[in-house]
Amino acid sequence: MSGHSKWASIKHKKGALDAKRGRIFTRLIKELTVAARAGGGDPDMNPRLRTIIGDAKAANMPAENIKRAIRRGTGEEPGVSYEEAQYEAYGPGGAAVIIDVLTDNKNRAAGEIRHLLEKHGGNLAAPNAVAWMFNKKGYIVVDKAKAGGKDEETLMNAVLEAGADDFQDDGENWEVYSAPESFAAVNEAVKALGIEPTSAKVSLIPQNTVKLEGKVAQQMMKLMEALDDHDDVQNISSNFDISEKEIEASLA
């Protein structure tokens, strides 16, 4: 499995730990604030905000926290002003990495991201050095064990009718792909079946993958973990391909 879906699975497995540290709430608050600032505070008119509100509710974030974050984004309440930034990089084994951040200090964030990359066998790349290796797609992961008894045909028909352009069976999960502009409708179609996706967002999907094994694979996992633990990092995309055995070893 390639890096985008593999890392989504890893993050899901470590979700309970993240929640204890408040990391999920911190990230969601930033995303809510920025989404409201960019597209307004009405979720009916702001698909990006509507999706993040759904994520926040799924994470059991209190309703007042959600409202407060949105009000900060619209300027109704004072708060920290976050800026979006994206860094392109190479990881161990030459794997491409794209790091999305929300930060109140771009210079500080860039320096810290550079340090983490160099510490774990990677390096920052020039703009557009690796971005061309990815396509922007709506990407939804459904855990078969949590599909509420719905079979593959039922889910596939629902998402294709809603605008999905690809549906894949990945063993434990089903993966649904769509154009970014169709993502909201496809995600709603999944939820209308009573299914809560493991992961659902507009993502950068690699066109090709780089297979990593052994020490290099473990080093890549350590880099991903270090980046994910950074307070400003919101999302990481990569084109690595690592076996389930290597993944389990990294989680042990």
Task: Walk through the language-model features, giving the residues of each.
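Positively charged, low-complexity, intrinsically disordered RNA-binding extensions
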Residues: 143-252
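N-terminal cationic and glycine-rich segments that engage phosphates or anionic surfaces
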Residues: 1-141, 182, 211, 252
